[in-house]
A protein has these predicted regions:
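ATP/NTP phosphate-donor binding region
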Residues: 1-61, 66-77, 107-112
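Catalytic core of DAGKc-family lipid kinases
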Residues: 34-37, 76-211
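ATP/nucleoside-binding phosphotransfer catalytic cores, i.e., glycine-rich phosphate-binding loops
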Residues: 5, 200-207, 224-318
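Short, solvent-exposed amphipathic alpha-helical segments in soluble enzyme
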Residues: 20-23, 75-76, 159-160, 229-232, ...
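Cofactor-binding loop segments of dinucleotide-utilizing enzymes, especially the Rossmann-like FAD-
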Residues: 8-10, 90, 243
Length: 318
């Protein structure tokens, strides 16, 4: 069986400890084709080489964004005949892989994959297909967790704070939650509704601003936030949660999220969907304006984002 191992060397763990990349390279000798990548161009080239060689298993390693970018590049290179996919988490959060039950040190996980050989177990996992219309053209990605509104605004703060992993994210959440009861400026920066229009399966939702827009194919979005508590229920229909509550009403409902229950409230949408689109309004003097969205921790922007079910992956379980 041909195996390709693709490492994102810019992932935080590998930047801090580059010897880990060397360990993976040595472990792959005689067992897999090894690719060390630094950017999307090198990632695309590695996936194209793997596809041309008929690789049966592509192992990705990095953070959640690396998994999203790698899955996107694999889908682009292989088309409908996708290989099995392995993932070795090496980012700050590793949210998707935790939902998949994959945890451990990259070298140990890779060794288990090699030793299992033909006995490797696989699980089927759904994905999102995300099409973004931007000033640069149309961008298509395959990912797992999409969000705008408070999701995008939270990540803006998270990166401003230095992307300090789960501990840093927890501190931000605690401050937002505390301030939401009194309408503090920090909480309002994140929780106040964001102007946008949303079409769900061809029907326009009634509001013109939303505080939360989130769709995912995994249930725990980090820190035990179970916003998309029905994710994965139907691989062809992602779970979409939309809410328009103002800061003072939305913040206190965090307990609903932790319990994996509907947030509720006037103007809310909560269900499985075939497709939805988020359209950001043009600002004064501009024909088209872009708004922020997040896909697997990567902060992006577009004028229109359309989300539907992506390909189902066969993911190896080390």
């Amino acid at each position: 069986m041909r195996i390709d191992v693709i490492v994102n060397t810019t992932a935080r763990r590998y930047e801090r400890a580059p010897q880990l990349v060397s360990e993976l390279r040595i472990a792959s000798m005689g067992r897999a084709t090894f690719h060390a990548t630094r950017d999307l161009e090198e990632l695309d080239r590695a996936c194209q080489q793997a596809a041309a060689a008929g690789s049966e298993l592509v192992v990705l390693t990095g953070g959640d964004g690396s998994l999203m970018a790698g899955t996107t590049a694999i889908a682009r290179a292989f088309g409908e005949r996708l290989p099995k996919i392995g993932f070795l988490p090496a980012g700050t959060a590793a949210i998707v892989s935790k939902n998949w039950g994959i945890q451990g040190k990259p070298h140990a996980l890779l060794s288990r994959i090699f030793h299992a050989g033909a006995g490797l177990r696989t699980d089927r996992h759904p994905t999102l297909r995300v099409r973004a219309e931007t000033a640069r053209g149309v961008e298509e990605r395959v990912g797992f967790i999409f969000g705008t509104g408070l999701v995008a605004k939270f990540f803006e703060l998270y990166y401003e704070d230095g992307a300090r992993g789960n501990a840093g994210a927890a501190r931000l959440v605690a401050r937002i939650f505390a301030e939401s009861f009194v309408g503090g400026s920090f909480a309002r920066r994140v929780l106040d509704p964001l102007p946008c229009a949303i079409d769900v399966d061809g029907e326009r939702l009634s509001r013109d601003a939303f505080s939360l827009v989130c769709a995912a194919v995994v249930r725990d979005l980090g820190l035990s936030m179970r916003v998309t508590y029905r994710a994965g229920e139907d691989p062809a229909r992602p779970h979409l949660v939309v809410n328009a509550l103002p800061t003072a009403k939305l913040g206190p409902r965090m307990f609903q999220v932790l319990a994996g229950k509907p947030i509720g409230g006037e103007g809310a949408f909560d269900g499985l969907v075939g497709q939805f689109a988020v359209r950001f309004p043009a600002r004064d003097g501009e024909a088209v304006s872009e708004g922020p969205y997040v896909l697997d921790g990567d902060l992006l922007s577009a004028s229109v984002v359309t989300v539907s079910a992506g390909p189902v992956l066969l993911v190896v379980k080390p």
